[in-house]
Amino acid sequence: MNFADSFRDKVALVAGGTGALGQEISLAFLDAGASVVATYRRKEEFDQLVSAAASAGFGTPAGALVDATDAGAVAAAVQKLIDERGRLDVLVNAVGGYAGGKNVWEEDLATFPRMMALNLESGFILARAVLPVMIRQNRGWIVNIASRAAYGHSAGAALYSASKAGALALFDSLALEVKSYAINVNSVVPSIFDTPANRRAMPSVDPARWPKPAEIARVVVFLCSEQARVIHGAAIPVYGRT
């Protein structure tokens, strides 16, 4: 489906919008004509996004250096966005982090709050900041980037799985809370997808079976389109052939 210019005059906040998947989501919304604000933690990653957008002939994304686990910083960034642009149509939560390789009884105690902050608390903070705006508008789309690990069966990554399961439940509950408004809330659920880091971590696995970040990004854009208004409270698997 071609979304060229279908998001013109819409504003998309892509939290974590410069990572391997987040960058492709930011680019996909730019390609569809949206005004994109991408949050980031590393300036060099935002610079890469700007360069990729320019090379593709897209508009220039705006950036916000924000720690998504800092409620005050997120609230300030959202307020700045509203002050400058007057509206917020889309939130994509692509913030997250991974820790694995240890059994539960071997894990450092510090790993638990870190996984919960990156993968669960950040989504709560973001949703809490943008929902009052979307409710006032009576219009909006929220997409949470979840993980197949949320469904369990992830030996060696129990804390990551638990944090992602919590986030999936959070956004599922949020969908029920806003069902009387014209606000759509969904999750996209990837498994392993094709990134340089995953190729390095699994050199013996054929990456041809993995979905590309750009393919997942197109699903995210579709879920934020008028054509997908009927999809609400869903968790869409994007596993490819993994």
Task: Give a label for each model feature.
Residues 11, 18-19:
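Conserved glycine-rich cofactor-binding loop
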Residues 127, 163:
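Active-site helix of classical SDR
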Residues 180-181, 187-188, 195, 203-242:
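C-terminal helical subdomain
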